[in-house]
Structure formats: structure tokens, C-alpha cells
Amino acid sequence: MDKKAANGGKEKGPLEACWDEWSRCTGWSSAGTGVLWKSCDDQCKKLGKSGGECVLTPSTCPFTRTDKAYQCQCKK
């Protein structure tokens, strides 16, 4: 899985990291998936990958209260 692929291959800044965690892979934001933003799988396919999934990893968002979060990771 490629952690940068869901962000177009770029390193993420703090706000981008939080957006990626909150918009695609959290339960409380799931109501916006498909309406406000693409699902993890659809975003990865848009980027030319075979798909993607939310994987529990160390959090990259400095504003979260936990050290782990689900992040969208694209398949190669």
C-alpha cells in the first residue's frame, strides 16, 4: 500500500493529513462519503491505482487525541 498515493503522491501537510483521516476513514464523517468526497477506494482508482482501503496506522494528524487513526492507503 502507498500512503502518499491517496494524496496524489505528495507529502502531506498537517491540515491535509487531518483531512485525509477525517474525510475518508472515520465513522463520524462517513455520511459525507460519496457526497462531499470520494471513498478511499474510489479516490485511489481516480489516481490510477487498483483500489484502496482504510488501514489503522499511526496518526499523522497533529490535532487528534489518539496515536492511531484509519488512513486511506492505495493498492499498487
From Swiss-Prot:
Disulfide bonds join 18-25, 40-44, 54-61, 72-74. GO terms for cellular component: extracellular region. InterPro entries: Macin, Macin_sf. Pfam families: Macin. It is found in: Secreted. GO terms for biological process: defense response. It comes from the Eukaryota. Keywords: Disulfide bond, Secreted, Signal. Belongs to the macin family. This is Neuromacin-like protein. It comes from Aplysia californica.
